[in-house]
Amino acid sequence: MPDETEIKLKIRDPKAFQRILKRLGAKPVGSATGRVHEDNLIFDTPDGGLAKHGQLLRLRTETAAAASKKSSKTKKSKKSRKANPPAPAKSSKPTRQILTFKRPTAQQTAAHTSRYPSFGSHKVRDEIEAHVTDSDNLIKIFEGLGMRGWFRYEKYRSTHQLPATNTWAHGFLIEVDETPIGTFVELEGPPAAIDRAATELGYSKKDYILTNYLALYAEDCRRKGQQPQNMLFPDKFR
């Protein structure tokens, strides 16, 4: 099972970050905007058996999204969140669905670090992915095995690639995630490449985030005195 090494970074000023990407020569990947809508559903046993062992089983549905349109400022409702982006138009048919299983590496399991699967400054886990063509029946299979979808979260992801240079032999992917709790960037690859990319983007190791979106969402809810449910955009942002 291949390793996944990654970090997250909080983007405080999305417009300034886009200017940095442009200065670095980053280009969209996959479409004119490199942008997709992701609808994620995490499965677990009723007692949270997978989570207890640092494991994750996720079904992701990706739908192509057009570039967001500039809109006038709107008044925020009590339920709306500060970081909600204007909703890009989505096609009605998913572009792809991916089933992902993640777990601690053998070294982490031996070191009893499954709950916080990271080495040093980077998050490291075993990861395996498979493309799905019949998600409805897959969900029925999971339910038949006693599993259920217990946390759903969505985001808009824009993927950009830095050009191949002496620094990046084959370029480097930068994934920008617009979520209901803010905008983040994910960097995945060899640790040295991640560190170089983070530096180019104006960050240092003290800015690295190693937790997942579920943990970030739960912390956001605690900070606001809200009960965690699903991390979803309000209808007006879809």
Which residues does each PLM region occupy?
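Beta-strand-connecting loop/turn residues
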Residues: 55, 181-183
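N-terminal strand-loop-strand beta-hairpin
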Residues: 1-171, 207-238
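Active-site scaffold segments
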Residues: 129, 186-188
